[in-house]
């Protein structure tokens, strides 16, 4: 009796590793990433192998070798699927009066997330000063989305709906200072970033620079390199198909980067010399734009986008640096002077400090009492006293963040 091994999922995903050990995948994927895969490994008998094998002869030494090799391949396929699809027992999460944020695991390049949407919503929670707990379980929401939250046993997915839910339940509002015109501009820019610029970023990460992205994935254990390769190439195929359906994927690489540059120049023009996109106070739009531009700046180092932001669009780079230092004090980039990098500094000189993660986060409770003096290092953007050139932007607001959120 010969058996095939495959994966059955309720989320429009079928992986077949039976007869020719090939991998086929069909997945419904949108602009908010669905990079995790779940399902059940099943085995099923193959009825038509008898005639084929009888034609090959019997009692041959290579026949036994074929059996052993086939069994080993099936066992390896089952193991790889188990590791790749992260099949595990569902953990019980107590979300009573607590925000549980489900997102992808931290990459190993020092950036909090390679997902612009995960970075967006986590930055929003920090801007709103809402304590939350991270869960890097890779589990998608019931709608197949990532990130998603649980609060008082209610599950909400989609960053826009998450923010609406938190505003309604907790009374926070980062946009209360915006007039109707500014709110309209904010929504239009949000859609440009999430529905247009996002796809150029995905192209850069998962198509054009796939090898570099593969190095950033935080996968450990046996066959980790093979698992990274499989996951990256699966994601590349998904991204290319989704980009083609969206329309951007029908253009050449040069045309895609031209569209990306237009979006970045539009953002740089909107920002101008302001502290935040809508003026002196941060808003939800800043969390959205930061999630995407920060990934382009620190998550794609050495690429066209990173060089364009750090070089010509200097105000966008300084804007991201301000937000990073204000709301991500534990995010240390050893190449902290990205914007002012010298010509002789190469990729080999870049190192990354592992992201210092906390199981529970509250900006006021975790960091304000600790003080930031110990975390200041001498870089080209600090003066001889050790104070950052960005301190005037960070510490001398005419209002408190707490008052803005209420």
From Swiss-Prot:
* SUPFAM superfamilies on file: GST C-terminal domain-like, Thioredoxin-like
The record's GO CC annotations read:
membrane
Query: Which residue spans traverse the membrane?
Result: 65-81
- Please name the Pfam families in this protein's record: FAXC_N, GST_C_6, GST_N_4
Question: Is Ribonucleoprotein given among the entry's keywords?
Answer: no
Stretches for region Disordered = 335-357, 369-389
- What InterPro entries is this protein classified in? FAX/IsoI-like, FAXC_N, Glutathione-S-Trfase_C_sf, Metaxin_GST, Mito_Protein_Transport_Metaxin, Thioredoxin-like_fold, Thioredoxin-like_sf
- Kindly list the places in or outside the cell where this protein is found, as annotated in its UniProt entry: Membrane
The membrane topology term of the UniProt record is: Single-pass membrane protein
Keyword annotations for this protein, in alphabetical order, are:
Membrane, Transmembrane, Transmembrane helix
The entry's function note states:
May play a role in axonal development.
What protein family is recorded? Belongs to the FAX family.
**Protein name, per record:** Failed axon connections homolog
Species in which this protein is naturally found: Xenopus tropicalis
